[in-house]
């Protein structure tokens, strides 16, 4: 603060000519009321610098002491306060409006920053929230589950397809479809001879339009059935099938 201004604030009763310079010359007629009169001019500490420049240009002879106010020009509450505390310096109420004026423009950016912060938070929340992340994770989990289920189904189908041809091929190899005529001729030959020579097996295969292997397999199965039913013993003394000697030329069925 300027030393001249501080000296003016400390002097509670400045001389009358100093205060008269700030009073309006038209206020003499209204002095009978006894009430303190404020100058009509908008001269105060809260005006802009351009107004202060015009005021100093209009009153070039004023000193810094003219800017101080007497207790008579203060409001009633402040006048009472000065009477109760004559030696106490002036309260800093003069500077409150200035500080308020300084705080108001500063509060704008702070409020703006808060609003911007909230708006930015809102933008962040709107652009990407935890719900979207969870939704994306859930969709990926569902896709992985679907893929795993498809792979399992494909593997099971492949295993089934692999098992079917093997079973069917075994069934085809084990069973041979014979006609009634073929079965009749084979049964008649088995009634006369339980074992066939290689030459006789060849003749039967040619007559019945079969292969030697098919004829051999049929006679082997028929002998096994006859043994289970009759409980007969093998005819050959060595207990070996006579056809086994000729089986070297033809592949065995088992």
From Swiss-Prot:
Residues 171-230 bind DNA. Residues 154-178 have a biased composition (Basic and acidic residues). Transmembrane segments: none annotated. Residues 86-178, 227-254 are annotated as: Disordered. GO terms for molecular function: chromatin binding; DNA-binding transcription activator activity, RNA polymerase II-specific; DNA-binding transcription factor activity; DNA-binding transcription factor activity, RNA polymerase II-specific; HMG box domain binding; RNA polymerase II cis-regulatory region sequence-specific DNA binding; sequence-specific DNA binding; sequence-specific double-stranded DNA binding. Gene3D superfamilies: Homeodomain-like (1.10.10.60). SUPFAM superfamilies: Homeodomain-like (SSF46689). GO terms for cellular component: chromatin; cytoplasm; nucleus. It holds the Pfam family Homeodomain. One of its GO terms (biological process) is somite specification. Keywords: Activator, Cytoplasm, Developmental protein, DNA-binding, Homeobox, Nucleus, Repressor, Transcription, Transcription regulation. It is found in: Nucleus; Cytoplasm. Mesodermal transcription factor that plays a key role in somitogenesis and is specifically required for sclerotome development. Required for maintenance of the sclerotome polarity and formation of the cranio-cervical joints. Binds specifically to the promoter of target genes and regulates their expression. Activates expression of NKX3-2 in the sclerotome. Activates expression of CDKN1A and CDKN2A in endothelial cells, acting as a regulator of vascular cell proliferation. While it activates CDKN1A in a DNA-dependent manner, it activates CDKN2A in a DNA-independent manner. It is linked to Klippel-Feil syndrome 2, autosomal recessive: A skeletal disorder characterized by congenital fusion of cervical vertebrae. It is due to a failure in the normal segmentation of vertebrae during the early weeks of fetal development. The clinical triad consists of short neck, low posterior hairline, and limited neck movement. PANTHER family: HOMEOBOX PROTEIN MOX, HOMEOBOX PROTEIN MOX-1. This is Homeobox protein MOX-1. It comes from Homo sapiens. The gene is MEOX1.
